Curated annotation (Swiss-Prot):
Protein name from the UniProt record: Putative membrane protein insertion efficiency factor
Lineage summary: Bacteria, Bacillati, Bacillota, Bacilli, Bacillales
Localization, UniProt: Cell membrane
GO CC terms: plasma membrane
Function comment: Could be involved in insertion of integral membrane proteins into the membrane.
Organism: Anoxybacillus flavithermus (strain DSM 21510 / WK1)
PANTHER family: MEMBRANE PROTEIN INSERTION EFFICIENCY FACTOR-RELATED (PTHR33383:SF1)
Principal location: membrane
UniProt family annotation: Belongs to the UPF0161 family.
Membrane-topology annotation of the record: Peripheral membrane protein
Database matches in NCBIfam families: membrane protein insertion efficiency factor YidD
């Protein structure tokens, strides 16, 4: 499942994103954030973090630097 999400994001980055002007108000961009979150936390938690990030991407949020959280050491 993790690989399917990664493929979907890579498809978006390669074929859809170049057609739109750059509008992401965050660094890293939402798609890069999603890739890193899914690679670090897996499909469920990484997908949750990605959706949460995308929901913050609107004109009323200041944006800025918003990295993927570090994985907690047990």
């Amino acid at each position: 499942m993790k690989h399917i999400f990664i493929l979907l994001i890579r498809f978006y980055q390669r074929f859809i994103s170049p057609l739109k002007p750059p509008t992401c108000r965050f660094y890293p961009t939402c798609s890069h954030y999603g890739l890193e979150a899914i690679r670090r936390f897996g499909a469920l938690k990484g997908g949750y973090l990605t959706i949460k990030r995308i929901l913050k991407c609107h004109p009323f949020h200041p944006g800025g630097f918003d990295p993927v959280p570090e994985k907690e050491q047990k």
